[in-house]
């Protein structure tokens, strides 16, 4: 689900969240965004 990478990808307060994005893409999602410092994958 959207939480595939929530515990595996750090989310900084500012900047581009590349670790989240990469983790989500590897998990088969379109990408990822950070919400309250947690990585959420786009379906």
Swiss-Prot record:
Keyword vocabulary terms for this entry: Disulfide bond, Ion channel impairing toxin, Knottin, Neurotoxin, Potassium channel impairing toxin, Secreted, Toxin, Voltage-gated potassium channel impairing toxin
Tissue-specific expression: Expressed by the venom gland.
Compartmental location: Secreted
Gene Ontology molecular function, alphabetical: potassium channel inhibitor activity; toxin activity
GO cellular component terms listed in the entry, alphabetical order: extracellular region
Written domain comment of the UniProt record: The presence of a 'disulfide through disulfide knot' structurally defines this protein as a knottin. Has the CSalpha/beta fold, which comprises one or two short alpha helices connected to anti-parallel beta-sheets stabilized by three or four disulfide bonds.
Functional note: Blocks Kv11/ERG potassium channels (tested in MMQ lactotroph cells that contain the three ERG channels: rKv11.1/KCNH2/ERG1, rKv11.2/KCNH6/ERG2 and rKv11.3/KCNH7/ERG3). This toxin can be used to distinguish slow deactivating components (ERGS) from fast deactivating components (ERGF) currents, since it specifically blocks ERGS.
Family: Belongs to the ergtoxin family. Gamma-KTx 3 subfamily.
Source organism: Centruroides noxius (Mexican scorpion)
Disulfide bonds listed in the record: 5-23, 11-34, 20-39, 24-41
Protein name as annotated: Potassium channel toxin gamma-KTx 3.1
């Amino acid at each position: 689900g959207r939480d595939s990478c929530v515990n595996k990808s750090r989310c900084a307060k500012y900047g581009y969240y590349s670790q989240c994005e990469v983790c989500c893409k590897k998990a088969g999602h379109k990408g990822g965004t950070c919400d309250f410092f947690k990585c959420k994958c786009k379906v």
